[in-house]
Amino acid sequence: MKAVLFDMDGTLVDSEKLWEVALHVLYSRLGGELTPAIREATVGGSAESLMQMVYTDLGLDLDPDEMAAHSEWLHDYTADLFDGGLPWCDGARELLDTLADAAVPMALVTNTRRALTERALDSIGRHYFTASVCGDEVVSPKPAPDPYQRAAELLGFTPAQCLAIEDSVTGAASAEDAGCPVLVVPNDVEVPGSARRRHVGSLAGVGIAELQRIYSQLQPGLRS
């Protein structure tokens, strides 16, 4: 294991609840009501896929300009919520500190747009990360492998040399398809298992030795 690639929303910080608040308000503005099924389907998705899902769910015309305007509103509203402070997921900050103290390279890999990610980094601490990749900076965001491929490249490693930490179906698929072994932490939506994934109850108490062990189990034959 040469580096660790972190998802942001729901993995490091419990920002998914703030996204849910913003989505409820957006649905009200559009004359509808957010259902649990739609909320579950949007977790980990890109801005574009989210708006398509919302408009399709409400039976609205897929007008690109109107969708873009509502997407901007949603991100601005969420940014204001982010500015109120982002609660840490269990064990996340401690793991970042441990990895930073050991000089393990880290990258942030998120489907969130750059502008909103920068607001989040004000709360999380940008000093932890050598690089960050956002959903609006790649040709295809998660679940495509592009974000994780790009993050590994920026760190100077192959995806197989990096352990990805994710909480969503789309994020785990993105990391796995890029070639990363994946450590999955729980969120509201269950992530299916696979031969290249390991699940933990939370990041609380997880240290470098545990990450190395998981990495070795998921990458047989590779030196960690």
What are these regions (language model features)?
Residues 29-33, 58-62, 102, 124-128, ...:
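Short helix-capping segments at alpha-helix termini
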Residues 1-40:
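Active-site neighborhood of HAD-like aspartate-dependent phosphohydrolases
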Residues 33, 55-94:
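Metal-dependent phosphoesterase signature
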Residues 20, 24, 47-52, 71, ...:
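An amphipathic alpha-helix signature
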Residues 1-2, 97-100, 113-224:
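Asp-based, Mg2+/Mn2+-dependent phosphohydrolase catalytic module
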Residues 11, 110-112:
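Conserved phosphate-coupling serine/threonine residues in phosphotransfer and NTP-handling enzymes
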